[in-house]
C-alpha cells in the first residue's frame, strides 16, 4: 500500500474524532472520505497532511513513517474548501508561490505555471486576480497551486462545497479526468454521496470516528456491510417489523430492515390483476406524489408502514388517496452491526428473473 493508516486515535477533549482508524490506499487511486458532519473525515485528512498530530498510531507514506515529519516535508498538496488563494496576488503568483518557496529558478517557474494553467483549462488567466474569477475557476487555480511543487499525494477538503450545483457537477468530471491524467494519489473529503460515487475509485465511509466500510462505489451501494452504511447511502427507510410484509413472513428474531425506493414496485390497483406476483403484493394507499424529473416519487402506506418508491412518468398518474399495489422485491435486514440482503420469497422461488 502506498498510504497506510495504522490504529490512528485522535481526541479533542472528550470528543473522539478518530477511533482506532486503519486503512490503506494503493498508489494512483482517488479515494473519497465520505461521512456525516463530525464523523472524523476531515480530521483524518489533516493528520495525513501533518496539520494535526494523532494521539497514537502510525501514518506511512510510500513505506516511510511520517509521524514526526512536519507538513512541509511530507510531499503533500492540499486544496481547501475556501480556495485559500492570496487575494493580493495574481493567478500566476498564486500558482508560483510554492515554487518560489522551493527556490526554483524563474525559467522553471514560468514553464511550470504555464503547464498547470493549460492542465486546468485556464491558459489565459495568469494576470488576473482571484476576485476576477468565478468560483469554479478559483477552485481550478487552487488545484493548480497545490500541484505546482509536484507533490506525491493530493488532499482535497470538500473542494466543491462552496460552488453552485451545476458547476459542481461539471467540476466532478473535470477533477476525475485531471487526476487520471497526472496519476497522482488523491484523497478528498465530502459529505455528498453523489460526489463520492461519481468521482472516487474507492470510498471510505466514516461514522463517529470509525471506519464503517471501505470499497468501490458499486460495492458500497449494493453491499452495505453495516446498518449505518445501508441507511446512509442512497435513500433509505427503516422498517421496524418486516415480518408483517408479504414474502418475508418467516422472519425470526430481530426484524428491523432497510428498504430503498429501487426495491419497490408500485402499480395502480386495477393494473395489478395479471401481474405474475400479484399474490405477493401489498395493498397500499398513496400519501404523497412528488415529481423527480425522470420519475415520480410516491410515498405510500401499507397498514402503518410508510414506504417510498419510484413510479414511471409514462404510467397512469397517481394522486394522494389512490389505492395501489406494492411489490417489495428485497430489503436489507439489520442484525446488530451487520446487514444482509433478503429477497422476497415469491421472487426467490420463482424461475422469473425479477430483481
What are these regions (language model features)?
Residues 247-355:
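Non-catalytic connector elements of ABC transporters
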Amino acid at each position: 500500500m502506498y498510504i497506510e493508516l495504522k490504529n490512528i486515535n485522535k481526541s479533542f477533549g472528550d470528543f473522539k474524532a478518530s477511533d482506532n482508524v486503519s486503512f490503506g490506499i494503493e498508489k494512483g487511486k482517488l479515494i473519497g472520505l465520505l461521512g456525516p458532519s463530525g464523523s472524523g473525515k476531515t480530521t483524518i485528512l489533516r493528520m495525513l497532511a501533518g496539520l494535526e498530530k494523532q494521539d497514537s498510531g502510525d501514518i506511512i507514506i510510500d513505506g516511510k513513517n511520517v509521524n514526526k515529519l512536519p507538513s512541509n516535508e511530507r510531499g503533500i498538496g492540499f486544496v481547501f474548501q475556501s480556495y485559500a488563494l492570496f487575494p493580493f496576488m495574481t493567478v500566476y503568483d498564486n500558482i508560483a508561490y510554492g515554487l518560489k518557496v522551493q527556490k526554483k529558478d524563474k525559467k522553471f517557474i514560468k514553464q511550470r505555471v504555464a503547464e498547470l494553467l493549460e492542465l486546468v483549462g485556464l491558459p489565459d488567466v495568469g494576470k488576473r486576480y482571484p476576485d476576477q474569477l468565478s468560483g469554479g475557476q478559483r477552485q481550478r487555480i487552487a488545484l493548480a497551486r497545490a500541484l505546482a511543487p509536484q507533490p506525491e499525494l493530493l488532499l482535497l477538503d470538500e473542494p466543491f462545497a462552496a460552488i453552485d450545483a451545476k458547476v459542481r457537477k461539471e467540476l466532478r468530471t473535470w477533477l476525475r479526468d485531471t487526476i487520471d491524467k497526472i496519476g497522482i494519489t488523491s484523497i478528498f473529503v465530502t459529505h455528498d454521496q453523489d460526489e463520492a460515487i461519481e468521482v472516487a475509485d474507492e470510498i471510505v465511509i466514516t461514522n463517529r470516528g470509525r471506519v464503517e466500510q471501505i470499497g468501490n462505489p458499486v460495492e458500497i451501494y449494493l453491499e452495505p456491510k453495516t446498518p449505518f452504511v445501508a441507511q446512509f447511502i442512497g435513500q433509505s427507510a427503516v422498517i421496524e417489523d418486516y415480518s408483517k410484509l408479504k414474502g418475508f413472513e418467516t422472519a425470526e428474531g430481530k426484524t428491523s430492515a432497510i428498504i430503498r425506493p429501487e426495491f419497490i414496485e408500485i402499480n395502480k390497483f386495477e393494473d395489478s390483476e395479471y401481474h405474475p406476483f400479484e399474490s405477493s403484493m401489498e395493498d397500499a394507499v398513496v400519501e404523497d406524489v412528488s415529481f423527480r424529473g425522470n420519475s415520480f416519487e410516491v410515498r405510500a402506506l401499507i397498514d402503518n408502514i410508510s414506504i417510498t418508491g419510484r413510479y414511471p412518468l409514462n404510467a397512469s398518474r397517481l394522486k394522494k388517496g389512490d389505492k395501489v399495489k406494492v411489490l417489495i422485491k428485497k430489503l436489507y435486514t439489520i442484525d446488530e452491526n451487520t446487514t444482509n440482503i433478503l429477497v422476497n420469497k415469491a421472487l426467490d422461488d420463482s424461475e422469473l428473473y425479477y430483481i
